[in-house]
């Protein structure tokens, strides 16, 4: 019984030695089958791994997993550029009408009574405003003898102030070559050039004495003036005739006295004394012309010296008939 086992022992020992030897040399031993008898045992000696075989076929996809829980909200991203403005929406329906308010209390003075009170107590001239403490040059409301309000430019700076300006030329922005009706009613721009109106001139000068001042400024900046003791304009029925007082003083000299007692003329109404010629049309203005003029302050706005004769803003005793002034103002003040 022991003999087969004793015989097998050397064989196994030999195989183990061979295996060890094969591992040292790097070769893989073969698989050996030991014992073929019925009572013999089979011993398998493991060899070295060989090269991997080819990959097997792809398996079927597995069933999808369930949806995971929602993650935490991330931080907001950078704001994009603003979009274009949308179209305006349709107008909504009107709101509910409010309740009627309480009736106001009656005024102690009616419209007529209030106007009469203002007329009685209101200023009649720029000189009147000056005596009431108004010292700034500007536009103010005064009241005519018939109680109508009138907005006028008050010069509170020149020669003691209190002057009501009725003619102003400063930049040529207003056309002064106008018809009779325009000069009757007045025209111009409150901020630049204007003619107050012959009807208003008549009302302002009809009662009480008004002195006249003419202020002139050249394009080079030199200034001059002329002053007269009185100035009055008749009504339209007398063609707005000029009644002028004595020349008092002035660096511009006297170029208006020759026009005393003359009617006003425009290009469509010739009231001068120049025979068959219309001085207003001839010299492109409107004035108290005789045959024709020594002054023409409503003439064309020309840039200083000019070649044309006597059709600019001229004052003969100042710069002559061929020089047109940059600025001309005519103003009256109660004396």
From Swiss-Prot:
It comes from the Eukaryota. GO terms for cellular component: collagen trimer; collagen-containing extracellular matrix; extracellular space; plasma membrane. Residues 117-335 form the Fibrinogen C-terminal domain. Residues 75-88 have a biased composition (Low complexity). Ca(2+) binds at residues 270, 272. Residues 326-335 are annotated as: P domain. CDD domains: FReD (cd00087). Residues 47-114 are annotated as: Disordered. Residues 163-251 are annotated as: B domain. Glycans are attached at residue 271. A carbohydrate binds at residues 291-293. InterPro entries: Collagen, Fibrinogen-like_C, Fibrinogen_a/b/g_C_1, Fibrinogen_a/b/g_C_dom, Fibrinogen_C-term_domain, Fibrinogen_CS. One of its GO terms (biological process) is complement activation, lectin pathway. Residues 123-162 are annotated as: A domain. NCBIfam families: GGGWT_bact (NF040941). Extracellular lectin functioning as a pattern-recognition receptor in innate immunity. Binds the sugar moieties of pathogen-associated molecular patterns (PAMPs) displayed on microbes and activates the lectin pathway of the complement system. May also activate monocytes through a G protein-coupled receptor, FFAR2, inducing the secretion of interleukin-8/IL-8. Binds preferentially to 9-O-acetylated 2-6-linked sialic acid derivatives and to various glycans containing sialic acid engaged in a 2-3 linkage. Belongs to the ficolin lectin family. This is Ficolin-1. The gene is Fcn1.
């Amino acid at each position: 019984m022991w003999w087969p086992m004793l015989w097998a022992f050397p064989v196994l020992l030999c195989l183990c030695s061979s295996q060890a030897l094969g591992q040292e040399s790097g070769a893989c031993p073969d698989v050996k089958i030991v014992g073929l008898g019925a009572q013999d045992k089979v011993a398998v000696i493991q060899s070295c791994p060989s090269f991997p075989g080819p990959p097997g076929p792809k398996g079927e996809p597995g069933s999808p997993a369930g949806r995971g829980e929602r993650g935490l909200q991330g931080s907001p991203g950078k704001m994009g550029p603003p979009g274009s403005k949308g179209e305006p929406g349709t107008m909504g329906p009107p709101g509910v009408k409010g309740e009627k308010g309480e009736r106001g209390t009656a005024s102690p003075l009616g419209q007529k009574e209030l106007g009469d009170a203002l007329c009685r107590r209101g200023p009649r001239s720029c000189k009147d405003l000056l005596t009431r403490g108004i010292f700034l040059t500007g536009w103010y409301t005064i009241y005519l003898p018939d109680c109508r309000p009138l907005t006028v430019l008050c010069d509170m700076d020149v020669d003691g102030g209190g002057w009501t300006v009725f003619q102003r030329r400063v930049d040529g922005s207003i056309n002064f070559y106008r018809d009779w009706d325009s000069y009757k009613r007045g025209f111009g721009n409150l901020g630049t050039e204007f003619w107050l109106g012959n009807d208003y001139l008549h009302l302002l000068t009809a009662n009480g004495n008004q002195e006249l001042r003419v202020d002139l400024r050249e394009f080079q900046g030199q200034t001059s003036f002329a002053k007269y003791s009185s100035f009055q304009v008749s009504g339209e029925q007398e063609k707005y005739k000029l009644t002028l007082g004595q020349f008092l003083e002035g660096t511009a000299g006297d170029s208006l006295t020759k026009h005393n007692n003359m009617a006003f003329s425009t290009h469509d109404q010739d009231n001068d004394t120049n025979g068959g010629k219309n001085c207003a049309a001839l010299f492109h203005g409107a004035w108290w012309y005789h045959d024709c003029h020594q002054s023409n302050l409503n003439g064309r706005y020309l840039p200083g010296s000019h070649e044309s004769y006597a059709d600019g803003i001229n004052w003969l005793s100042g710069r002559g008939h061929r020089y047109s002034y940059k600025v001309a103002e005519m103003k009256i003040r109660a004396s």
